[in-house]
Amino acid sequence: DTQAMKALILNSQGKTEEAFDLAKLALKNAMKSNVCWHVYGLLYRSVKNYDEAIKAYKFALRLDPDSRQIQRDLSLLQAQTRDWKGLVDSRRTMLTASSGVRANWTAMAIAHHMAGDYQAAEKVLNLYEETLKVPPPSTDLEHHEAVLYKNTIIAESGDYERALQGLKALYKSNPDRTAVMELRAEYLLKLDRKEEAEKAYRNLLERNSERRDYYDGLEKTLGLDKNDPASHAQLQELYKSFADKSERIDAPRRVPLDFLQGDAFREAADAYLTRVFRKGVPSTFANLKALYNDESKKQTIEQLVLGYASQDNNEENGKNWNLAVNYFLAQHYDYYLCRDLEKASEYIQKTISLNPSRQDYTFHLTKARITKHSGDLDAAAKQMNEAREMDLADRYINTKCAKYQLRNNQNDTAIETMGLFTRKEATGGPLGDLLDMQCMWYLFEDGEAYKRQKKLGLALKRFKSIHDIFDVWYEDQFDFHSFSLRKGMIRAYVDMIRWEDHLRQHPFYSRAAYSAIDIYVKLFDDPSTANGDLSDADKKKAEKKARKEKEKAEADKKAAAAAKATATSEDVVKKEDTDPQGEELLKTKDPLAEAMKYLSPLLEHSPLNIKSQQAGFEVFVRREKYLPALKCLVAASKIDSNDATVKEQTARLRKTRKLTIVPSSHSRHLTDNIQTVSGLKEPLPEKIKEVIDAELATLP
């Protein structure tokens, strides 16, 4: 046991290998010690090997079935790994041992709920309520949350009538009044009690007249459909009744523009535009650009605003009128659906001349965006920097400027710009602080800039940082398995669990993964790309920069060592970055195996994204795994059979009966998907040929 405890201490000091060796020795000396097995599980948990940790915990429980600590640690890991059936058993044991703790009852209900047993979850919560001899006080938020959680379980089981009856007692007592009202309206609508549902949604709109979900619910209760022209007159009258209640409300004036057509749309758009232009609302175009998918609406808006621009301003329109109209037209002609950059530049220059403020950078920002769309990234970055200098205390324009600098491949300048708003004392400088803040947009843009410059090591470093951030998000939920139960925030905890299950559907993960996969495919096709494509001058510059960063890294290392020597038990010493340039990432002997680390989550969580399937094809076909490649190709074809990349990949796979892929020094981006081929070293097995032929016959 002493050896096991020493192993635990060594692990906390970062000596993981030594800790495991000592823990194994402890097990060898005392195989039947529950402490040794528990510590062994804790070591595996610290290295994120949850499966082995669970095995160790279970073995420890066999030796000491009454250990609450081991049982608790096991239950937390079962929640982390989504072993809901195992969690039910663990929570039942814990509840039996400590039935007086409310958190144990709640945890048991959650386990049943997540396992899909709604009836058992409700029963557990009811049993606890029956054990209460004194009703909880009105200030007991944990009780109110548990009761509302029980109501949502009943609703999820499909028994909306009983859930609705339960809400009646909650309305006056539950502090989350809005949630109760929303659930009541939802239940009434599902039960087809439309008159009561209409009243419920109108009450919600009295509380928040800008919430579009409430308007959608109200439309359903009235049997109105935006896609049905016969309903448009009634819908227009409905929204007018809400708009007339207050001049400040925007939603009932904006929503009708989505479904109105023809003259009715022109009249409503005219009224809406006149109202917002008189106020000088800068976000008007952002609020209306969704309408541009309808060609007739786009033309109507253009005609109306051009008409405003041609008229002389009057006192009724106010002093902001000309400024707002010209700014709208600048954004209008910059938008990709009606792009005319010459006109956009003309209107933005006129807008800037009308703007008396020397600190309002809004119009200068749009000018830089127009320049960017013209293709002059260097001028756009300079213009955005000029906009930044108009208000040096504004973080948003500072961030925007850094993004434009990255688009212009000015990585060093961009990090200096970002450094104006990062902590000066942060380890690793501005980049280290951005990593701590998990600033994914910067890491992605920085990686893309390095990728364009053929600095693939640094690019991979940035994309891997994003990959690691999602790992951190996944690991962070571990603490909430116990924290949320202690605090009684049950519904938020369940929402978090469901959100974590789809974590890697996040667009930032997908974008970083596609770029990383593309680089690894290039490394497989042509390993010499790891050396980059730099001129002698660029190489000297890179070497000089590397030396400076190495010196800085050594200084940081010494500082970290000094901090470690004087650190207390509460101090956290950051891990040293041994590969700041990403050189080790480029030296991988199996690029496709590294690509699979990014690809597997994509195929699991974003299978409906055609880029995921196309990336999967490129990786699998190079690994000569033709059936998985075929599966990706079929999935991509179902998403969009007319996609050019799908057709090219289909043609390539049809040649696999006679040809195989070999490395090419001219591999292009994944979106090009063009690869050279030569004769097969070995013929494909007959069964694989048959499957490929059968599936390919169904593809265009």
Regions found by a protein language model. Give the residues of each.
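Non-TPR docking regions that flank or precede TPR/alpha-solenoid scaffolds in eukaryotic proteins
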Residues: 1-700
